[in-house]
Amino acid sequence: MNLTKSSVVRACGAAAALFLFGCGSSSITGDPAANFAGSWTFASGSIQPMCNIAGIPAVDLTGDTMTVTRVDPTHVSTMLTGTDVMCNVNFTVTGTTATAATGQTCAVTAPVTIGGVAMTVAVKIDISTWTLNLSGDTLAIAMTGTATAEGGLLSCTPTADGSATRPASGG
């Protein structure tokens, strides 16, 4: 077979373009969980307690860190640690949205006054919904749940929202 230099260059160029196109598309659509992975720091956000006992302050998430770890192409696990909050939650990823399965929990400590006695109460939040929405290096969260403590004396329907960022390199 006798090929000219221009034929060889065109064939190599076409092969390289197909290779690069294939690599680019797999990282976007084939492994969406990889886009969530990294260390995220909350620039803003809070958990609003929404309890039957007045005066329980919101849990501020500002400055707290959430580490997101890729489990497989469509699943991530998260670890949110901060003052008064600890959450280890698993999510299913579709595109730029990750959704938590119900039945998972977060642990929060809250200062409360019950019967005139001030105390700190450990509260387990049962997660009803929790989504992570990714836009570049910004992650928005939205969570709803239910919680009880002190034998049902404290009853809450907490919500959370916030925005976290990571270094442009993906953290």
Give short role names for the model-derived ranges:
Residues 95-97, 140-171:
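Edge beta-strand at a domain terminus
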Residues 40, 99-103, 134-145:
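A short hydrophobic beta-strand element
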Residues 33-81, 109-129, 151-158:
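Short, solvent-exposed loop/hinge segments that bridge or flank secondary-structure elements
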Residues 19-22:
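C-terminal motif of bacterial Sec signal peptides marking the signal peptidase cleavage site
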Residues 2-13:
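Bacterial N-terminal signal peptides that target proteins for export
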Residues 68, 87-95, 132, 164:
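Short, surface-exposed loop motifs enriched in S/T, G, D/E and P with embedded aromatic residues
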Residues 24-41, 167-171:
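N-terminal helix-cap/turn-to-beta initiation motif at the start of protein domains
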